[in-house]
């Protein structure tokens, strides 16, 4: 028997007020995004030393968070929700004067168990190369520095030296070893970090560190580039009967494609977990989240996710990935990363809706995930969604070329709750209702659900993307990457 039931719906969308735009309500924000996404810009005077971090966090609104249902509660705080973490975001002169903050810092009060996941692009940026080396040397880290404006990719030895000098200067200010400081960069490929501006801004950045919600919010804004919304989330749950928190922030809206995407992320938790288990858990969650999103099929040079575990919750120490406590923490980590990943896909350049592809009945999770990725990545599927065309043929074709064997007579496709294909054969369906389903999602920047079953196997997986609009071409024709 084939199963192709839609999963639970996710949380509602919430937006804070915009800086200087208190009369702009949530619906107006959504409509502005949906009609002409990158024409919607919110700039304010660059944050001065007297500006509060709460003001910095309102340069752009916060993204909607699409958390899966589970034994957790969404809480405020982002990367600072977990015990032991502080964050800050300031304007440091790396962007043009008057734009958003461009320097962010996340620190931990103790040696945090550290893990990272990085781009598969062979032209990896200098900060990616540095972080890989640092994590080979040390199992712990205390700080993550992020700059926006310059990617510091394809910059040769000089770009790598810029990383070493930046890390060394911050380590000195924080009284840490250089390998305890990690770094992420985003911006234009081929441009080195504006090192002078960065170094001059580090004292102010360190002095701005705060364990507050505002600290987390300002950091989440500072790492954005073409993003229209900042992405930040935190949850509270239990591991072994003890309350723990997991939080995170991410950026990305273009150059999004597995593996990883043009995205940066920082994940924090106060759970106690040993290094080997933590690194395995982080890779598993990345595979279920950031490696399952696609906007335009391009894989960036800078993709990085750094995950830090302070262990300050007082929870039981996790040293076996197969134990019950590890499974509890893994589920929390999956939820946070998937929430952030879906927000990135929702914010795809020029997009009017999020596309969520769910595949069931495969032989394994990995095989289901690969089929879901193929469908979510298909330019023809994405264009059909934008055109409000319930084109089941494009969905079936994408599933078929994913490289995963299945019998086409087992193929079943649903669009929302409308059955388009069953037993490998197209069905008679209400095209007007299906088109209206797509149209409504586009009007409110909502979610289009595509559900596919390929057999009776135990494997299921999801992938997320967005529709492909005229605005995507316009945005990327005008923006230098």
Swiss-Prot record:
Miscellaneous remark of the record: This protein may be expected to contain an N-terminal transit peptide but none has been predicted.
Record-level GO BP terms: L-arginine biosynthetic process; ornithine biosynthetic process
Enzyme class: transferase
Catalytic activity reported: N(2)-acetyl-L-ornithine + L-glutamate = N-acetyl-L-glutamate + L-ornithine; L-glutamate + acetyl-CoA = N-acetyl-L-glutamate + CoA + H(+)
CDD domains xrefs: OAT
Keyword set, alphabetical order: Acyltransferase, Amino-acid biosynthesis, Arginine biosynthesis, Autocatalytic cleavage, Chloroplast, Multifunctional enzyme, Plastid, Transferase
Membrane spanning stretches: none
Cellular component GO terms held in the UniProt record: chloroplast
Major subcellular site: plastid
Superkingdom of source: Eukaryota
Function according to Swiss-Prot or TrEMBL: Catalyzes two activities which are involved in the cyclic version of arginine biosynthesis: the synthesis of acetylglutamate from glutamate and acetyl-CoA, and of ornithine by transacetylation between acetylornithine and glutamate.
Record-linked Gene3D superfamilies: ArgJ beta chain, C-terminal domain (3.10.20.340), L-amino peptidase D-ALA esterase/amidase (3.60.70.12)
UniProt-listed Pfam families: ArgJ (PF01960)
Oligomer and partners: Heterodimer of an alpha and a beta chain.
Entry binding sites for substrate: 225, 251, 262, 349, 476, 481
GO molecular function, one term: glutamate N-acetyltransferase activity
Disulfide bond positions: none
Marked site (Involved in the stabilization of negative charge on the oxyanion by the formation of the oxyanion hole) residue numbers: 186-187
Annotated site location: Cleavage: 261-262
Residues at the active site: 262
The keyword Ribonucleoprotein appears for this protein: no
Identification of the protein by name: Arginine biosynthesis bifunctional protein ArgJ, chloroplastic
């Amino acid at each position: 028997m084939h199963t192709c039931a839609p999963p639970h719906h996710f949380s509602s969308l919430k937006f804070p007020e915009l800086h200087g735009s208190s009369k702009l309500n949530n619906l107006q924000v959504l409509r502005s995004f949906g009609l002409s996404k990158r024409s919607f810009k919110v700039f304010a005077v660059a944050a001065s030393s007297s500006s509060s971090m709460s003001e910095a966090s309102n340069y752009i609104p916060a993204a909607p968070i699409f958390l899966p249902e589970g034994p957790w509660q969404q809480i405020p705080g982002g990367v600072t929700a977990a015990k032991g973490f502080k964050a800050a975001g300031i304007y440091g002169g790396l962007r043009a004067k008057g734009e958003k903050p461009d320097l962010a810092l996340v620190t931990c009060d103790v040696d945090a168990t550290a893990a990272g996941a990085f781009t598969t692009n062979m032209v990896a940026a200098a900060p990616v190369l540095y972080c890989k080396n640092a994590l080979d040397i040390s199992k712990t880290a205390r700080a993550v520095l992020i700059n926006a404006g310059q990617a510091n990719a394809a910059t040769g030895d000089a770009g790598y030296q810029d990383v070493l000098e930046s890390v060394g200067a911050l380590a000195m200010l924080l009284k840490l070893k250089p390998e305890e400081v990690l770094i992420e960069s985003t911006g234009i490929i081929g441009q080195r970090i504006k090192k002078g501006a960065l170094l001059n801004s580090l004292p102010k950045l360190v002095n701005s560190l705060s364990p507050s919600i505002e600290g987390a919010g300002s950091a989440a804004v500072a790492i954005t580039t073409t993003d229209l919304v900042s992405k930040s989330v935190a949850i509270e749950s239990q591991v072994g009967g003890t309350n723990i928190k997991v939080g995170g922030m991410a950026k990305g809206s273009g150059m999004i494609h597995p593996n990883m995407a043009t995205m940066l992320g920082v994940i924090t938790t106060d759970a106690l977990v040993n290094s080997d288990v933590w690194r395995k858990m982080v890779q598993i969650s990345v595979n279920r989240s950031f490696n399952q999103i696609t906007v335009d099929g391009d894989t960036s040079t800078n993709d990085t996710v750094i995950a830090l575990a302070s262990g300050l919750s007082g929870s039981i120490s996790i040293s076996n990935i197969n134990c019950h406590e590890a499974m509890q923490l893994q589920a929390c980590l999956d939820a946070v990363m998937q929430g952030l990943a879906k927000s990135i896909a929702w914010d795809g350049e020029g997009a009017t809706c999020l596309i969520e592809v769910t595949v069931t009945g495969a032989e394994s999770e990995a095989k289901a995930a690969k089929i879901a990725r193929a469908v979510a990545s298909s330019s023809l599927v994405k264009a059909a969604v934008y055109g409000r065309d319930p084109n089941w043929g494009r969905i079936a074709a994408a599933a078929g070329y994913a490289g995963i064997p299945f019998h086409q007579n087992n193929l079943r496709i649903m669009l929302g709750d409308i059955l388009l294909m069953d037993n490998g054969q197209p069905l008679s369906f209400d095209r007007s209702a299906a088109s209206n389903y797509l149209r409504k999602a586009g009007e409110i920047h909502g979610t289009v659900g595509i559900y596919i079953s390929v057999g009776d196997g135990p494997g299921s997986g999801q992938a997320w993307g967005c529709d492909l609009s005229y605005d995507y071409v316009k945005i990327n024709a005008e923006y230098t990457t």
